[in-house]
């Protein structure tokens, strides 16, 4: 009958007893494995082999990365077990499979920024100071790799000129990118630009855009604040090339469609608003759930107006960006 799903879930071994761990962080502090790229900060800083995945994680319980833990790999170390006063470390844990019956399933696979290897003209692979908007978000976050201080990844200096580039891979019918608008880029770029101007008034900010799309409630007013109150320079035009100079700066070569001319800007950082695409887990999950998808691998709702969060498959519900680009 509808809503009677038997689901098998693989629960990965944490190697830490959740009922005993207090989240004190002493094990992380003492762990000798220090040079593991931090996935949550997109590899811009490092974590330890035992760690709490991110700030404000729920539950606030440490986990051990089996691929990098010396004790789990070769039986040599055990520092975290020695310093844990709660006795929460358990190297004997194994992955377990849980089988339960559920009345409904919610697909919430989210999204990923598009890979930028096809867009070499923006210099992402050539310079550490060309970053994606998500990387820039982490750089400005208090829990990020620089504790919220905006610094250039290449040399740790403060950037005095930042160029934001819109629609990198969005609205692209060439086959390299995505044909659809990613919807959220115009607003988060305006937010980032205002954050920079508010915290660092000496920093010059430029935004290159095709169109500014701000259809939501108070969205256009938000964008106008960036221009009128914060002095963000919006330039309607396309960026043709970004390349590093010998002195460490970046040259942005672009067109200004309003002035009808080619321009060059010397920048300290370039931020790319990368297109949103479905998470790679979406298609395999849809196959398991027998749920329908569109040509872009987003889940399809039963009816856009009458049943906007239901899949055509009874008992399967859709949440967030699994249906398409969305803001919070």
Enumerate the predicted regions with their spans:
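Residues forming the flavin
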Residues: 1-328
